[in-house]
Amino acid sequence: MKKIIHLIKSIIILSLLFCSLSCNTDQTTTIQANVTIKIDETAKPYNPMIFGGFLEHFGKQIYGGVFDPDSPLSDNKGFRTDVIDALKELKVPIIRWPGGCFVDGYHWINGVGKNRQPTDDIRWGVIEPNTFGTHEFIELCRLLDAEPYFCHNGMADVQEMTDWVKYSNANEGKFADMRKKNGYPDPLNVKIWSVGNERSGRDYIHKVRDAGNAMKELDSTVLVTCSGIHGGSNIDPYLFEAAGEYLDYISAHQYWIENWQKHSTPNYLSCIMLSEKPESYIKKVINQIQSAEIEGHINKGQIKIAFDEWNLRSWHHPGFQRFEKVDYNDPEIIKLIKARDKSLDPSIYNLSDALFSASFLNSCLRNSDYITMANIAPLVNQTGPLYVHPNGIVKRTHFHTIEMYVNELEKYVSNTEIIGSKLTNGKDSVSVIDAIATVDKKGKKWAISLVNRHPSENLECTVTMGNKLLNGTYKAKILTGESTDSYNDIEHPNQVSPKELELKFKNGIVQLPPHSLTIVHIESI
């Protein structure tokens, strides 16, 4: 029997090698893939913090997003109840706040107490009302049962940073008394702190060293993160040498479609060609950490990756010279700030976003030894998975991807071998399939995620578990749309939403519809 199975697998692989590997939309071809799940190898646990989120005081993420005291949809503390209910579906495990670039001009002291005053937001050229600060964020995290993750102003001195730690975590002292006076007698127990956002250079590294040392002396239980790699940069090896002993995480940021000045909306194939980029980016960070381990600057396994800003599309914020106060009445400034709202358009977020997000999360799961946190940026509005408007919410396509992964996958990742035809677009190509297999602790219940990236063709996928071709009918959930450009908006909020179905496998073969994400549940092999 084993010989027959191996023969079948060999035929499938040979057919993939000798068939036309170009799967352009202007020709009809047989699209095939082979997924082999190594059920005899030990599955490894992953950290659910890879399903985390990020909120910044930018656009309508905070004000007009999660927090809107004047809205009839808000509770008595100002939180939008519809937003809270939707985010609970994502079981958001951790939220990073308050930035992001915003944090470069943020002073935490302005966001606590009763007599808060508006300040100039030197990063984004708006007025920050400071009505949402430390305690409001903690209240949000408590509503969502999420771990708070604070990011320090990287331009502030170490004293300001440690004062915030004292205010948040101390039982007694000047800042603990201040917190108690503000209505919070018990420590806030904030455990994860980042020293700045997207900063670099020797002076910054020395600040990381000093701040990390100071924070851990105050509270030995805190976990320290710092800027490591963003965009096309590399981690400065000196960071590990000078500050490595105080670090628990290294931060990685990447957005794969650049929207900084010019708002762009590439087509489906252009977006899908980026699907394998996260894997190589993560491997790059892992290699740099491993080099530091080999050189003895850090202990093996000491530093994990916090991919604490990620998304297919970067934020759109054309503008002015930052770090300078602007004239808020200047028509040009008003025009530039208003232009940021282009990214709120629901029609932008289609199956590209849903399937790219699945591939990003698959990359995190495959590399879960090192990557233990990831935060989609942002969680709400701009390019985030949840669009919030004055009268309600819209769950964008990638909202459903995250919701499916959080609620459908099991807790351990199994090694999986994937062989598939290539999907091409000009000189670029990616595998037509992506897959991840998860299993429960007892090794009995499986949840397998299968992504067909092809825009227009069904994918004939052969699934082998160990040495056994999968046969039978199993419960599944599928996310797709009528076309690659399908999206959700106010008038049509459910054009792209998960559907339950029964999926039939015969001799290991299952048909996956085009531009789709499918998670299938298997309880007996």
What is the role of each PLM region?
Residues 1-30:
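Bacterial Sec-dependent N-terminal signal peptides
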Residues 23-235, 240-249, 278-279, 283-316, ...:
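Non-catalytic accessory regions flanking glycosidase/transglycosidase catalytic cores in CAZymes
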Residues 246-249, 257, 268-276:
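Active-site cores of enzymes that catalyze phosphoryl transfer or operate on phosphate-rich substrates
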Residues 254-270, 320-322:
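Active-site His/acidic residue clusters
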